[in-house]
């Protein structure tokens, strides 16, 4: 019984990780980028920066 329990547990964990990995990665990337941008561009307004990035991303996705 111990063996079976271990196996089922690892299986469920791997499934959960696969689903959640992409989201976590994206969040980490965004957080890091935004932090760096803040440090570098203290003068530039945050709104304009985010808007520009969002538009460029949308265009790229639609065209390609």
Curated annotation (Swiss-Prot):
GO terms for biological process: chromosome condensation; sperm DNA condensation. The keyword Repressor does not apply. Testis. It is found in: Nucleus; Chromosome. Transmembrane segments: none annotated. InterPro entries: Protamine_P1. Disulfide bonds: none annotated. Keywords: Chromosome, Developmental protein, Differentiation, DNA condensation, DNA-binding, Nucleosome core, Nucleus, Spermatogenesis. One of its GO terms (cellular component) is nucleus. Residues 1-64 are annotated as: Disordered. It comes from the Eukaryota. One of its GO terms (molecular function) is DNA binding. Belongs to the protamine P1 family. Protamines substitute for histones in the chromatin of sperm during the haploid phase of spermatogenesis. They compact sperm DNA into a highly condensed, stable and inactive complex. This is Sperm protamine P1. The lineage of its organism: Eukaryota, Metazoa, Chordata, Craniata, Vertebrata.
């Amino acid at each position: 019984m111990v063996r079976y329990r271990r196996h089922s547990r690892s299986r469920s964990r791997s499934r959960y990780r696969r689903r959640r990995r992409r989201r976590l990665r994206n969040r980490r990337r965004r957080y890091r980028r935004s932090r760096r941008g803040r440090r570098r561009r203290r003068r530039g307004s945050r709104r304009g920066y985010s808007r520009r990035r969002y538009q460029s991303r949308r265009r790229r996705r639609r065209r390609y």
